[in-house]
């Protein structure tokens, strides 16, 4: 019986030893695999960095990374070795996301990642205090982080054709140098408060959205000289539009406007307006022009049409008032 106990104990010990050896072997294999994977990543990063370096050029004194129509769904961390870059120009690369380490490129002046498949803007974007241009048109972005308001040098922001952006954080009104904003072809139903409060904004495109009404506070954009609102569902214009003294270009084609407010005659800075393809209640025909160029200008600019429409509207209104106030004769002869 004693021999049986000793034998059982020996077997148990041998089993434990073998289990320990097997466990150690598995761990060694795992470590070896991880080491090999690490070597592969290091090698791939080096290869990627070499490829990226080939895409770096100097133009007008700026260091630019330019990639066109070449697949780069992600950008490797080895790109950080090129942190002196001042411009990224990556178009049609299939890029899925802006890297989280973007904030470490403190020298960036222009970030142009248009025509990719980017779905979000990382909060680290706010660390780019020297950034002057951010161009993210033709992507799949749905929201804009409030941290973007920390890009104090930003002058140009393009978010066109992302199709699903419907609002902007109010913090973006802190972008005191922003002069150019393109929000066309998205899902905005009104002009965001942040936009109305951007003090330096000169150029705004909100065409091809779902705007139905323009806010009465539209005239807060006193620096605005160009406003594109084509292809929306706008039904009327606020009277306060007369106060936009610097507005020179106003495009309202393909909307649901039924009238042109008479106060627009006071907008002496207007040089280009377009009311084409609106269900206006009055039909106004301009007198023929003496030359072909003049006819093209009439049709394209619409400024003469606007003034003619307002005059016709007033004339029609005067006729209605006259008919309303004409006393009817109730006396009979004899």
From Swiss-Prot:
Cited PROSITE patterns: LRR
Induction profile: In cardiomyocytes, down-regulated in response to biomechanical stress.
Tissue: Expressed in heart and skeletal muscle (at protein level). Also detected in kidney (at protein level). Not detected in other tissues tested (at protein level).
Any one cellular-component term (Gene Ontology): M band
SMART domains named among the record's database cross-references: LRR_TYP (SM00369)
GO biological process: intracellular signal transduction
Gene3D superfamilies, per database record: Ribonuclease Inhibitor (3.80.10.10)
Chief place of localization: cytoplasm
Highest taxon of the lineage: Eukaryota
Keywords per UniProt: Cytoplasm, Leucine-rich repeat, Muscle protein, Repeat
Compartment(s) of residence: Cytoplasm, Myofibril, Sarcomere, M line
Keyword Ribonucleoprotein: no
LRR repeat boundaries on the chain: 59-82, 83-105, 106-128, 129-151, 153-175, 176-198, 199-221, 223-244, 245-269, 272-295
Keyword Cytoplasm listed: yes
Function: Component of the sarcomeric M-band which plays a role in myocyte response to biomechanical stress. May regulate expression of other M-band proteins via an SRF-dependent pathway. Important for normal contractile function in heart.
Record note on quaternary structure: Interacts with MYH7 (via C-terminus).
Name of protein: Leucine-rich repeat-containing protein 39
């Amino acid at each position: 019986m004693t021999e049986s106990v000793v034998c059982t104990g020996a077997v148990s010990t041998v089993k434990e030893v073998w289990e320990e050896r097997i466990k150690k072997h598995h761990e060694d294999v795992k470590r070896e695999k991880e080491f090999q994977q690490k070597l592969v990543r290091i090698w791939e990063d080096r290869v990627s960095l070499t490829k990226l370096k080939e895409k770096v050029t100097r133009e007008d004194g700026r260091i630019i990374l330019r990639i066109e129509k070449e697949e780069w769904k992600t950008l490797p961390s080895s790109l950080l070795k090129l942190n002196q870059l001042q411009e990224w120009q990556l178009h049609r690369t299939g890029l899925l996301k802006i890297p989280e380490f973007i904030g470490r490129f403190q020298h960036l002046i222009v970030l142009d990642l248009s025509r990719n498949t980017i779905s979000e803007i990382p909060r680290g974007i706010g660390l780019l205090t020297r950034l002057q241009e951010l161009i993210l048109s033709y992507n799949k972005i749905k929201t804009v982080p409030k941290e973007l308001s920390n890009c104090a040098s930003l002058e140009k922001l393009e978010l066109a054709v992302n199709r699903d952006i419907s609002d902007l954080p109010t913090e973006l009104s802190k972008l005191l140098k922003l002069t150019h904003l393109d929000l066309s072809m998205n899902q905005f139903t009104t002009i965001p408060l942040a936009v109305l409060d951007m003090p330096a904004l000169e150029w705004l495109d909100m065409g091809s959205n779902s705007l139905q009404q323009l806010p009465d506070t539209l005239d807060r954009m006193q620096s605005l000289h160009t406003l594109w609102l084509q292809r929306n569902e706008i039904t009327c214009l606020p009277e306060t539009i007369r106060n936009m003294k610097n507005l020179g270009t106003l495009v309202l084609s393909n909307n649901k406007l039924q009238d042109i407010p008479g106060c627009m005659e006071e907008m002496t800075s207007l040089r280009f307006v377009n009311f084409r393809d609106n269900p206006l209640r009055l039909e106004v025909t301009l007198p023929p022009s003496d030359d072909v160029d003049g006819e093209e200008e009439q049709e394209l600019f619409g400024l003469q049409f606007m003034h003619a429409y307002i005059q016709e509207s007033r004339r029609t209104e005067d006729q209605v008032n006259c008919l309303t106030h004409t006393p009817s004769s109730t006396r009979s002869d004899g």
